[in-house]
Amino acid sequence: MENYTLLPFFGYLCANFPKRTNRKAIRTHDMKLTPIDRAPLLPLALCLVAGIAVGNPFGTGWPLMVVAGVLLAVTLLAGRWPLVQSLGVGLCFVVLGMLVAPAEEGGVADGVWTEAVVASPIAERPKTVMADLLLTPSGERRRCYLWKDERSLQLKPADNLVVSIHDRQFVSRDGWQRGGNGLSHLSAFQRLRLKALLWREWALQRLHASAADADAQAVVAAMVLGDKRALTRELRDVYSVSGASHVLALSGLHLSIIYLLLTRLTLGRHRFWLGQVLIVASLWAFTLLTGLSTSLVRAATMLTVYALFALGGRRHAPLGVLSFTAIVMLLFDSSALFDVGFQLSFMAMLGIILFMPLFDDKSPGLKSGIYYKVTHGAGINYLSRGWWDGIKRNSLGYLLVSVAAQLGTAPLIAFYFGRFSTWFLLTNLVVIPLATLILFGAVVVLLFPAAAGLLLMVVGWMNAFLSFVSRLPLASIDHLQPSVLQVVLIYVVIAVIYALLFRLVGRRR
């Protein structure tokens, strides 16, 4: 048997890039595997997460490097004991996670004047102006509140400042002035990101060309460009109670819709490779334009890997791709692990990857999914053929994806936000098709601003529907306060449910 223990990444590639020969044997082998069996990178990703969560107890990297060297040597010498090799590789990734774990915050002391660069659009508050500042040359990023006046209201991304910060976030009226050369300390990528924020401001002006409902404009800005500054507290509560907050936060849902649109617009099969290159470049350009949120980076990375598989004519293991994406993102920015958006994005995708094969009648390794049984019953197709059949099947697909994603994220949502939306199925059945229409319409509005009125009218309909859902009886269960242990136990119960469902649905022989 081939052993990929020492080279997990290349082993993963070999496992997912089978030779074109003996396809029947490959299919027979795949039928016996669960999604977890097809993800050899999953244990390594979990080990990396564990190392980052533990952190570096020594304060310096040298002791950990010595430990990593010893573990690597033992792993290389343990060729006759695969279990020892596997444990060695896992421990190496734990140590790697400890090495890349974010250090404790230090940074610039209070009251010290330092150069800074405005790294976000300003957001007005009753008495202050909120903005993210990049403190140079240390590179520390802080969310600061400046005294609101005519000067602070004119700030924009990429402006050079000299500031004196108190209590780590407050800047007085006389505590800042324009000047310095902070941009020179930034990398080319950071300067490009600041330039992208200016482009986003231009795009926002195009979207706001129509003097329509302010709430509708705020929703379009959040959905299309990730700008939530104009969202009122009441509007946020409506989306939260109805279970549609994920629509306001740019995520894999939005990027998948854009991917679908670009796929329809690209060239034919004889130019397939060029179409995939253009699609991937466009996805990353959009991700950069909207601020490189963790959920979008996750989705863009996964779609890029999928495009590479498509160009090679190979199959992919979604859970393996998700694990690879987590490893890459955490190695570049280990602090992302503690970001709520990162956790929700990966857990939602994990729920979809694990549970959707149980619902889908075309999934390998299953006799017939729940999706098949619901739509066909005991050998009878209750859904008529044709366009009406397509509407029903797509509607059921939206519901099943919502359930799968909710199974992955509900415990975390209850832990962080203390709320569970009970009408999320009804919400997603209407909101997901409307979100698709709104994103398509936003592209048209960027080219033809005169069409903004029609787009904002559709958004107004969506807002009205969500407002209706938020007023339904028992629209949400509030004041939930689960502990970390309770969240872990809930996920254990979900894992048991998954195992039982997998056995219930059955495998092909």
Regions found by a protein language model. Name each.
Residues 292-495, 499-505:
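Internal transmembrane alpha-helical bundles of multi-pass membrane proteins
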